């Protein structure tokens, strides 16, 4: 190791190199207001019995204790009372047996992969892959492993059952020909003024094919057969669409207004990408490595959501610029993580007295550094351009959850939302959200109601993100320990193909995968039965079945690999050495997904750039959906965060009347293709069509997702 490398290594462990390391952002007055809100009595309506009796008359305390549940809630009957506990114990016993069988099945699959498939040169290449610390070196090692396993031939072949390669072939050919015609017109001028310009035909083509998961090109299975990249045809489609969008943006034959309407249409159809960070106590520090990998490769989405421990990481990311994050996401950051610094006797006495292990005010003080003091969601967006979302659950079990962001709660203080999202019963008592008033002082938010851990109901708020920000592509970093134990992709995951049969087999063989799926689904079934029959106990007034039955995955799911010692340190601060390992593991788990994310953001960023350049107001431009929602809220708030875009959202208008020429071009190109595997004639045979449809497979990863698990 050279002297420069040794110096760089020392720097990443030196806390003095961290920006704002010694700075305390929190204002003591803010903490006092927060303490006052926490100690405020619960609001209770006072209603007199009648006009002559007092409101609070003295009555003797009844000796009869109030039942835990009312009959109206549980619909008690004779059979319910008699069969409840025997049925509950029987189901729990069966789930225990299934859990033991599941452990044996996973052990068999692990031994099968370790001692049957990973041997010889394949094992050596895999070890080299796991030792890489940056993406470029990792990519070279992944390509070497793909070459050895013969995966390059799979990339060169167009046919695959999980996407429509025939449609993609035709679209690529049409885009290429129309783009070349548009480039010729831009250089030499139009030859015939009666015909519409080629760039308009290109816009029609793009409006037809720039959609979320068009023809299956964003199916994760397309990236699950190799360690790097995807089908050559899919990559060609992504590159061609990007080139065509750039040509439309640079064209002088279309006005800025028409371009803006065009990009609004594309943005609505294509949607947005969001990064979702799960909870998981100190397991959430693996998110730092995931963030660092995405940041170093310029694929960090603007929309970020976090829950519980993931909310702390998301708050750090949303309140810092890229340059600040690159300096912060190093092992020295462990010196600022001091949430669990108290001794055993201190927290035991507190837990016995208050029912919570940690002190809320101390956590508020520690958390404020990660959130840059009492920064609000609106202020964080104005500073970095990132949209922070934090999932919070009300302490009242009958109230809906909230996804706090700069649209739903713009003046809410971030550190209060992070504390609320991390308030697990028994660990931290429910807290009050705080809002910043115009004079800069803090006050209780939402009438002083208290909130708790968002993971209890909505660890990954996919539906709320789609509602507020048109998100339809989610990157989930999942570190919940109780979920990681049951994570298993029988056909491989993005950048992690199956270890044998050149990635086309089943993990542990078909029988091993079938047994694993059956046992896991059976356990899930019995938990749902207990929940729907209202048989599950509710410790601390919480339905704990949601921590198992909600959806925890996304379009891309990143699963950092934990080790047994992480469970021992689940409620303790990391040392710089342990955080360094978690950073490395987090980056390693994100490297296989980067090419998929790059392809997605390549088109999305081009669309956003078009909105940016073609907008009349300039400045930061949001997507049309965000713009429309922001305009609605601007009528209620005098302080505007960005310049208002036009509130109308019309369909794209074009002066192009005669579409016969475009139809002729489309029909002519449908019969030909530059790719070798496209049939020369139009499919007209019924038997040929039936054969083609029978060869199409669908990704069933979301088939068993609970539709009611994620609320807004």
Swiss-Prot record:
Pfam families assigned: DUF3336, Patatin
Gene Ontology terms describing biological process: cellular detoxification; lipid catabolic process; triglyceride mobilization
Any one GO CC term of the record: lipid droplet
Compositionally biased residues, Basic and acidic residues: 1-13, 632-646, 652-664, 677-687
Motif GXSXG: where in chain: 306-310
GO molecular function terms noted in the UniProt entry: triacylglycerol lipase activity
TM annotation in the entry: 85-105
The entry's keywords: Hydrolase, Lipid degradation, Lipid metabolism, Membrane, Transmembrane, Transmembrane helix
Mode of membrane association: Single-pass membrane protein
InterPro entries recorded: Acyl_Trfase/lysoPLipase, NTE, PNPLA_dom, Triacylglycerol_lipase_N
Residue spans of biased composition, Polar residues class: 665-676
Function according to Swiss-Prot or TrEMBL: Probable lipid hydrolase.
Family affiliation: Belongs to the PLPL family.
Protein name per UniProt: Patatin-like phospholipase domain-containing protein NFIA_019760
